[in-house]
Amino acid sequence: MNDRADFVVPDITTRKNVGLSHDANDFTLPQPLDRYSAEDHATWATLYQRQCKLLPGRACDEFMEGLERLEVDADRVPDFNKLNQKLMAATGWKIVAVPGLIPDDVFFEHLANRRFPVTWWLREPHQLDYLQEPDVFHDLFGHVPLLINPVFADYLEAYGKGGVKAKALGALPMLARLYWYTVEFGLINTPAGMRIYGAGILSSKSESIYCLDSASPNRVGFDLMRIMNTRYRIDTFQKTYFVIDSFKQLFDATAPDFAPLYLQLADAQPWGAGDVAPDDLVLNAGDRQGWADTEDV
């Protein structure tokens, strides 16, 4: 999701999409399978194998089950059409290829109709450990396996429908924070301990370790209003992770009309990314070691 008012297409997106065209309305395009080089497939295999070695015991069971049920290719960039056969049969979702970041209204419309936009291109070998823009590994490996879980699938559809309303109400920054702290960087309590479900973590080797093992970040119980009023970081590891108890809790929290909540928060001073609020359910208070002093989003 892009929550910037000044939507700008990153240079790498422009370069990767030379010679391709997308639909002017929904930004989709046929997945250009012939564009993937042997180097691309090798890069995918490296990323996939690295995360699959690391994530057992760290990722939530629902993610690992989804990865297995979808039979995501380990040695090459997957064919979206083949994945869609299994995904649509499970929850009615499908993935659609897009050139990169897309405008918010288009993004919300896709989610509201059970279509998940996946950037078609892959990062380059020197970008294995960091890429600011989402690529096919982040979008597909990180996000798509959980779409086979019916409760999470319903949550993401509801989020898309809420996004259309939020944009009309000028409340997009609040809803963007909810996406960031759940879909991208969420943790979940399980009987076996705290686990990862956020795609931004699941697709990152270093943050998969940091979010659970480091003493630096705060880990705080899920609170909808708190999250929608909390800034975040896009350039470093997160200072705070919000922890849900179940995907049902996440879905139930988004069921009410958000319009009154937006009004309540309209004049509220947002919490900083590393702040601990008086009413927080603090599971782990971070020691703040290594935190960058630059501004939050």
Curated annotation (Swiss-Prot):
InterPro entries: ArAA_hydroxylase (IPR001273), ArAA_hydroxylase_Fe/CU_BS (IPR018301), ArAA_hydroxylase_sf (IPR036951), Aro-AA_hydroxylase_C_sf (IPR036329), Aromatic-AA_hydroxylase_C (IPR019774), Phe-4-hydroxylase_mono (IPR005960). The keyword Iron applies. GO terms for biological process: L-phenylalanine catabolic process. Monomer. It comes from Chromobacterium violaceum (strain ATCC 12472 / DSM 30191 / JCM 1249 / CCUG 213 / NBRC 12614 / NCIMB 9131 / NCTC 9757 / MK). It catalyses: (6R)-L-erythro-5,6,7,8-tetrahydrobiopterin + L-phenylalanine + O2 = (4aS,6R)-4a-hydroxy-L-erythro-5,6,7,8-tetrahydrobiopterin + L-tyrosine. Fe cation binds at H138, H143, E184. It holds the Pfam family Biopterin_H. One of its GO terms (molecular function) is phenylalanine 4-monooxygenase activity. Pathway: Amino-acid degradation; L-phenylalanine degradation; acetoacetate and fumarate from L-phenylalanine: step 1/6. Keywords: Iron, Metal-binding, Monooxygenase, Oxidoreductase, Phenylalanine catabolism. The keyword Metal-binding applies. This is Phenylalanine-4-hydroxylase. Its EC number is 1.14.16.1. The lineage of its organism: Bacteria, Pseudomonadati, Pseudomonadota, Betaproteobacteria, Neisseriales. Its cofactor is Fe(2+). Belongs to the biopterin-dependent aromatic amino acid hydroxylase family.
